[in-house]
Amino acid sequence: MHKTPVLTLISVVIAFATTSPAFGAVISEPIPLWPKGAPNEKGDVGEEHDTTKPGDGLVSGQRVIRLGNVSKPEITLYRPSKEKDTGTAAVVCPGGGYSILAMDLEGTEICEWFNSIGVTGVLLKYRVPTRPGDDKHVLPLQDAQRALSLVRFHAKDWNLDPKRIGVLGFSAGAHLTASLSTTFDRRAYEPVDDADRVSCRPDFSMPIYPAYLALKDQDNKIAPDLNVTTNTPPTFLIQAEDDGVRVENSLVYYLALKNAKVPVEMHLYPNGGHGYGLRPSDKLISSWPKRAEEWLRGLGMLQTRNP
């Protein structure tokens, strides 16, 4: 194993950053995940682009960026202001059915919310759509494992606490969050450099309106790719009972975590549907970011560090 050029240059990339008007945040340049290209990637999905069409539905009166044909995965760091910075970071996994990525609704907007509570948001642009003949989840899991390890590997360089690095995701991204939280001891790819010697176990896990966790045709058994153990990280779950993706996804995961004695908090709301992110509405479910903040505070993730 050795330190590759991409690892050496990442700290330089962070130095070339822009300031966001929200909360005085600093946004890094995008950082490629893989020094020599992503594993198992053929690059034959077409040009990356926003697939949203004029007639596509709005969320809270706003359009959604639906990014498709991602073959070059990367992370972008959203840093909170120095006054708020807790040293905690969260990898953010947008949803989109493993077909597209809802990059603003379930990505940039979430990173900005994390900044407001002193957390660095690490926006993960993982590979979509599923390639013909490939398992739906393998390439995204490779990217998520690599992202978590890369952030932890650079924790000192980026002034982060290596013991406060978690993951949050929505819908398919919530499945990716749960997968990362239950397979961190088994790399989905051959290690490529020193970053892969670092654990990819999240310190906290936040699947929001998850998909693919329950097997509908098998009496809602938990999906076999999710190996919940006592080492699965503390987990926070949100879902609406009228979610068309089925609330059983949260229920079976909650029970598996509870039976494994993993700290878990779940909030179910009578209505809210699916795919709302944290955009405001008149529904009670719009209060979930406050519940999430309280949960993170209870874990000690929002304590400011001593100067």
Q: What spans do the regions from the language model cover?
A:
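C-terminal catalytic histidine-bearing segment of alpha/beta-hydrolase fold enzymes
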Residues: L251-P307
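Short beta-strand/loop motif that positions the catalytic acidic residue
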Residues: L237-Q239
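Active-site glycine-rich loops that stabilize anionic/oxyanionic intermediates
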Residues: P94-S99, E241
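Primarily recognizes the serine-hydrolase "nucleophile elbow" in alpha/beta-hydrolase
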Residues: Q142-T230
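Short beta-strand element of the alpha/beta-hydrolase
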Residues: T86-G95
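Catalytic nucleophile-loop/oxyanion-hole region of alpha/beta-hydrolase
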Residues: L101-M103, E109-I110, L124-D161, R279-I285
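N-terminal cap/lid segment of alpha/beta-hydrolase-fold proteins
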Residues: A25-D85
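Conserved alpha/beta-hydrolase "acid-adjacent" motif
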Residues: G244-S250
